[in-house]
Amino acid sequence: ILDNAISIPDEISIGVVSVPTGLNFSSQIKKVKTLNQHANMKFTFSNPDYSGLVDKFEWANSALIFAYDYKNKVNISNLTNTGYGQIARFAQQDFYLPLKKNIKKFEDLFNDLNIRNETFIDNPNHYDRSLFEKSGMGWQGKSTMMLTPGIGPWQLLGTIYVEINFQPTEERSFSCGECNLCQISCPTGALDNCLLYTSPS
């Protein structure tokens, strides 16, 4: 269905996970909220029972996980000019726009074929990291960021649940190993004391 119908740029990677997965992150999210370690953030924390639930739809048989690599889409001078404030790559423009544009191609195809689907992009009702590791696309680093070899953390995620059975991508094992430079370098210690639910020990 997809190979002959949709063209996507090299910056978009796609992984596939079979559902149901049995995964549920609700208790972790609620624990962080109870301990007041979420810095009063409402995103994801507003409805943990639903946002942390991976198997949201009984009709779904697959989840397509999209990652948009934006590391080469920025003005590097904004990061390297001395004497000026540095603007984070993520903040230089709305990188969700190309991600949404390409995911919509899949939505439109599924809808045209009357294939049931549901999309989550930057949505507080879905913990979008939950399927990233299982898809084999990368891992959750000690920096709390989702990392992919050759890309690093400069990517945005989206998910489509779909009723079709797609062949899942291979689940692979990644880790930071003994490296903890991000935790050592963090000036406030936030990587150890704040977003613990996103950072492996």
Q: Where does each model-flagged region fall?
A:
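Local cysteine-cluster metal-coordination motifs and their immediate loop/turn environment
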Residues: F174-G189
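Conserved small/polar residues in nucleotide/adenosyl-binding loops
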Residues: Y197-S201
